[in-house]
Amino acid sequence: MRKTLAYVLSLAVILSMTMMPAGTFAATGSAPAAPTAVKAVAKTETSIKLSWAGSSDAKGYAVYKYDGKSYKKIKTTASKSFTNTKLKKNKAYSYKIKAYKTVNGKKVYSKYSYKVKAVPKATSSKKATNVTKVVLDKTALQMKTGETAELNVSLKPNGKLVTNKIVWSSSDKKVAAVDSEGKVTAVATGNCTITARAHNGITAKADVNVLTDLSMAEDISKMTAFTKDATEYAEKLGYELAYNMDLADDKTGFRTAGSDAEHKTADYLANEFKKIGLADVTKEAVTVDKWQFNEAYMTLNYKNKSGEAKTLKIDDMVSYAAQGTKQLGGDYSSLEIADMGRGTEAEYQAYYKKNDCKDMSGKIVLVGVDQWNDIWIDGPYMEAAVQKAAAIVTYPVGGYASYDDDTLNMQDICAPDMKMPCTSITKNDAVRIKNVIENGTAVKAELYVDNEVGSQNGTSYNVVGKIKGTANTGQQILVAAHYDKYFYGFEDDCMAIGLVAGIAKTMIDSGFKPANDIVFVAHGAEEWGRFDTSTDWAIGSWEMITKVHPEWQGKTLALINFEMPGVDSYNDNGVMRTTYEVGGIGKDLLASGLLANVKSFYKNGVVVKNDDDELPRTDCISYQFNGVPAFMPRQEDKSQWSKNRYHTPRDDNNVTDTKGDGVHSKALIEYQMALYSALAMYIDGTPALELDFNSRCDDFEQAIEGTEKYATATSVAEYKAQLAELRTAAKANLEEAKKINADYEAAYKAGDAKDMEAARAAGIKHNTEALKAFRYVQDEFMGLADYGDIEVHHKCLQNNLDLYDKVVAALSDGNITEDDIWIAADINGYYENYAYLYSDEVCTMSNDLLMNTKVESNWGSNKMTLAIKDSWKTTKNMYAKWNEGVKDAAEYKVFADEYRGYMDTLKTKLQAYVKSETGAMKVLKTML
């Protein structure tokens, strides 16, 4: 149906295009831009060479010479230069250039370029000559709005010139204007270039930076002078954290939750923080499930077809957060090994039938996984344990580790402790093992895994240091990254720690004295830190904000967090991802001119994106759910880098791109340092935190679209009515914050310290209430649509209802197809997919993991609002029916009815959420 519709639409478009009048497209063919950088230089006593910068869409150029009355065309050329010969000696000639392109067989010309005037080479020193060089006494000006400055020009040679007249121009008159004498007037914040042009097009330029007059402008300007040295420091620190094997647990570079390497690195970072000059440096202990990988290998002993004894040694092996053979004990020295394909229940059953056995006791299973496109590691791992395998050895078949077939990969396991080893090898090593299995005889495998894991038995350290505030506000701003890693982890996240320390260094070196505390945190246990949950990452940060420093809740103005900040994936735009309510702060900073003297790393600058998709996959989630708004740079279109390098040994300090996926960029690190140092200083310098709750209202409004299909019209109308009133309150709240900040700036400009202090006090009071409201939004409205996407509670259910409804419709239209059968896979945040692949035991465990039924406290607790826990049973039975070859629609009615029952349950829950959210809007309105 959709393909047919697409074809019809495409045909209609093609037909409409072919029937358009001939001139239709010509209307869009506007004239090319006029040539720029036109110059006229004497070549001989009778010739002058003209040159110019071309226009991007021009086909050619026309040269015009002044004949005493008008400009006459003397040459048409495709080149960007022309030499006019046979000229009279010592006579001055004037020229202009036009660009042209051809549209519908006709030439369309640009406007004239500016005029250039020159003489051929002088026949004697007494004759006039051309300017050869223009020199300005200043090549850069830094000004404030309203200020003026003089640019003085000198011309070379010093003798008689055709004319000494100079034409002055500004690249942006809205930033700075220049008069005919070279007097520059700063108009508005920004950057522009002033050009002095001589008669023949020879120029000199001066860059103008008009600074904002905001109170934090001077501090930020000073800071930017120190980013170069701080970047060198950040690069060295990032490299040390990645490649110093004394700070790793094994030869591949692992540094995981509560491990010896984490502890050593915490000591190292605490020392670095002190050397930078941070105050109150501490190592804050947090409880995690310990994981320390030390070593793993496997040896296959077998006989080849000639009966010769052979050995295959697999040394390139790492372990997931699962038990090691050393820790479990027992004999792993002579095990069978079986190729189990993708490790599904059906493949095990087929193996049992073929080999006349009932389980995998005494066997290692070899399983291929694609954790990008297919299924996470928890499914194959749990299924292997259910089938009583001695161990599972996995390898990538797609998605991650795509760099090459000799690349290892590692991810968080998102599973219970199944008391069974689970390791990862390369695809090429898997091919070697398969070859032995297929062609060898008497194959026996010895597996050795030294991997220490345990539940609530580990201690990780978050390393903290601060630049103390001077205003005794009781508030703070956090700047953070994590230092645990897989393999080298150069980008993820060693360079991020380097950047955090670099920001601290550049602030301290520049003499910055914040009003609020600026707290720098190196988190441990971000990659993994908890068994028995699908939300097993960001545990170090969760423990920090909930157990170690719960007092940070309500006093932390923002978290600025970093993940892989130095990867250049060739984007024209950088992205500042933010919690919805603080996106406006990022936009205001970028528009403020505070970074006018910092060249953007990105061609089209940085865009701000309200984000509930990427932030939850980082430490930001722990803080956001506890009332702290978050910022984080994150490039778009980085998927190929992630597929090739993320969580592999290829996450390294590569600066030469051989895969088209991206490189490490020191220049990007320096830009991030300037931008996000400025962000922290900007937030610090504005007494009132300008939270825009109307941005979150946009989220609420989008969430209610389509809800009337499942909730009463009255309840939806009440929701929308309350939302309209909430918008009014949100607008007033933001205006109040802006007024406080405007009062502060006015007092600053007036030099009124008393009024500045009063505005600061008003800001503290405002922030206390605004952060309470922000936390209330997180508590009352926001849930998880799956294990990593934040969504409004009722919308989580609505997403699931839409899927159930789609399944019911497909099963009820009288024509059952395989596509119909697979629609249900997306239910419950894609966890329903397990019903097609795995045993009842695994499906039960996966739903427990999704719903966090066995973990009392982590950021996913009580947040997963979408699931009907047992719908997988219906899906599994439906799929079994299909696999029996049944296509009779009547046979699927029972499943459609069961799905309708789940929908009824979800509708009741959704209705309750719509009601509770409507009530919460009333409360939130009063809080604002």
Region roles according to the model:
Residues 27-57, 89, 106-123:
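Pro/Thr/Ser/Gly-rich low-complexity, intrinsically disordered linker/stalk tracts
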Residues 84-105:
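Beta-strand-rich modules
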Residues 125-215:
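Extracytoplasmic soluble-region selector
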Residues 228, 243-359:
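Noncatalytic luminal/extracellular "stalk/propeptide" segments of secretory-pathway proteins
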Residues 256-258, 315-421, 606-609:
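Extracellular/luminal Protease-associated
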Residues 319-351, 411-490, 502-512:
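Soluble metallo-hydrolase cores and metallopeptidase-like ectodomains found primarily
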Residues 523-643, 724-792:
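Metal-dependent peptidase/peptidase-like ectodomains
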